[in-house]
Amino acid sequence: MHERGPSMSAPTTYRGSITREQWLVDETRTVARLRLEDRAFLDTRALAAHILENNLFQYPTEREVGSIARACARRLDALSSDPDRRDRLTGLIAHGTTEQLRQANLYALMRDNRLVWDFMTCVVESKFSLLDMHLGKTEIATFLEGLRAQDERVATWSPATLNKIRQVLAQCLEQCGMYERKTEQLSTLLLDYDLENLIRENGDAGILPAFGLAL
């Protein structure tokens, strides 16, 4: 898998829970706003209780509200180890434009889940570097099979789980405006200036080619 440089912040855990958690852009914006407005909501129990009581996710049942609220909070926590920088990144998700929200949400996913980090820096970055804009289902599946051979946690995942993860990875790219699933074509982003600067400040400039940018 992609080797991280000394200043890059690749997470260590491959999270199969992405099959359930998925993109969550609206939920993450809701959580980001709450946490910036009231520091009491840095406590995930208080956060989940408030979301549930006020039906802020507008889910038809209460069953998944707590776990999804915790997942959103975990992703926001993963944005940076520096509190000020984390707040600024959270601000892009909470109050930014639609493009800032989507792009920062993808960055949060990368920082939270080694699966997404490796997919972006191994597969997507390689495609951009080769000017090969076709990303087929089989290529994503091959990437996941490679992980399965290298990581004990991933090795326990069933073929059905891996297939669902393949779909979620493609969906995340599409939701961010980087992929068209029908044609299986990638496209580079016009990465938001503020987000790019925060990524650089965060020591993660090495991931910029995964968004189609030069270092």
Q: What residues fall within each predicted segment?
A:
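DNA-recognition alpha helix
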Residues: 136-152
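Positively charged, polyanion-binding regions of nucleic-acid-associated proteins
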Residues: 104-107, 111-133
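Short, leucine-enriched amphipathic alpha-helices that occur as contiguous helical runs
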Residues: 28, 116-117, 137, 166
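Eukaryotic partner-binding/assembly regions in large regulatory complexes
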Residues: 2-103
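Contiguous, well-ordered alpha-helical segments that form the cores/surfaces of helical PPI scaffolds
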Residues: 118-122, 142, 171
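Accessory, usually C-terminal, subdomains that scaffold auxiliary metal cofactors
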Residues: 155-215
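Inter-helical turn/loop segments and adjacent helix faces that build the functional surface
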Residues: 127, 149-156
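Alpha-helix boundary/N-cap detector
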Residues: 22, 60-63, 67, 111, ...
